[in-house]
Amino acid sequence: MYFSNCMHKLNKMLIVALAAMGFASANAQTTLPGSIQEAVKENVSAKAVMENIMTRTSVRKFKQQPVEDVKIEALLRAGMAAPTANDMQPWHFVVLKDKQDIEKYAESNKYHAEDIKKTPLFIFVCADTTRMAEGQGKELWVQDLSAVSENILLAAHAMGLGACWTTIYPIQKKVNGISRTLNLPDNLIPLNGIIIGYPDEPEQPKDKWDTKKITYGIPN
């Protein structure tokens, strides 16, 4: 029930955003594979959501245009609508949108400093170790925050933004370095940093459909 409610809320957010920008109907006949068109042909809401999923792609180059606060909040709300194990909600977000904060972060990453400076918005998705399951379920936060991150990526695309998931955890050197740069308390572990902004140029999604990677039923 919790998962169903979360998805219902996210779907409503995506549909509103898609409708507002006239995206839901644009190129729907050409971008959706035939099997998906057939599955959603009688449901406009489902069609809008599937269109958003199938056309999302990673974007790394952005216009020098700030992301509006109302959209930042929408992204965070979409993230917090994700399902989590035992409803632990082990998330904490660090948002960098001010130029001085972004430049400070860039100074700590000499290999990508110039690209970082050109990025309008960072959302670091972190795990709160005080809200984790015990025993064998301790690492479930990785799954939880992966669902959070995908919600943010899809919501960004729905609102006309581009985004890309940049890995931090489990590379310990990155975890330690970014934790120091962001001055994170000991109870927070950064899973990733999502870079977000208005795309500088159109990006085409990859066709990743591969029937060889599917098994139906239990093999003998």
Where would I find each of the regions flagged by the language model?
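Acidic, surface-exposed loops and disordered segments
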Residues: 2-17, 26-220
